[in-house]
Amino acid sequence: MRTSSFLDRLISEVDSALRTLVLPPKRITTRQSPAENLADTVLSAQEKKHISGLMRVNHAGEVCAQALYQGQALTAQLTHIKEQMASAAAEEVDHLAWCEERLYELGSKPSLLNPIWYCGSVLLGALAGLAGDKVSLGFVAETERQVTAHLQRHLHYLPEKDKKTIAILKRMQEDEEHHAHTAMEAGAVELPYIIKQLMNAVSKLMTQSSYYI
């Protein structure tokens, strides 16, 4: 049986990048949006603007997560780790679709900075993979912990009447917690404090810029 070469994986990565960054009219998902059967809520122009900013940040975060997983799958050493990264990336596609759909409903669009975040995250993921599978899984666990905390903050910032966005973020939060738990069970190592702080600083830069652009 023919084994996957680095070139094969690189071509797959380019394909994944295009699928992530080039926005289709409607992205194909494996799961229905949590907001699918919820009624629309009357929102003021200011509320729509604020919610759009938050969802633009969440969408950018999912772009980063997708890229991180793809980069790690590119250099992961063990087959089951590669498969785990690919599975997690597939769930992140659902998150991308849900965020995109909600943005369009609000009359907005994703961040123009997404290509920058994607490239940086792919590089980080690939470097983490080269450092070893346990380190790579450590990046997954820490990334998902930070994303979970970030989603929790956004849930506090949303108007209570915006049931659609709340439902989406809660489901995303559940998935991210599961990804972190799975990574730890698979043997993730705890990252050094300085690395966690650096990741947090980059995350803040992404959130503050993507809210507006």
Curated annotation (Swiss-Prot):
Whether Cytoplasm counts among this entry's keywords is no
Task: State a GO cellular component annotated for this protein.
Answer: plasma membrane
Signal peptide residues on this chain, from the entry's feature table? none
Annotated catalysed reactions:
a 5-methoxy-2-methyl-3-(all-trans-polyprenyl)benzene-1,4-diol + AH2 + O2 = a 3-demethylubiquinol + A + H2O
Q: Which GO terms describe its biological process?
A: ubiquinone biosynthetic process
Q: How does it sit in the membrane?
A: Peripheral membrane protein
* Matching CDD domains: DMQH (cd01042)
Q: What does this protein do?
A: Catalyzes the hydroxylation of 2-nonaprenyl-3-methyl-6-methoxy-1,4-benzoquinol during ubiquinone biosynthesis.
Q: In which pathway does it act?
A: Cofactor biosynthesis; ubiquinone biosynthesis
Q: Which organism is it from?
A: Legionella pneumophila (strain Paris)
One Gene Ontology term of the molecular function aspect: metal ion binding
Q: How is the cofactor bound?
A: Binds 2 iron ions per subunit.
The name under which this protein is listed is 3-demethoxyubiquinol 3-hydroxylase
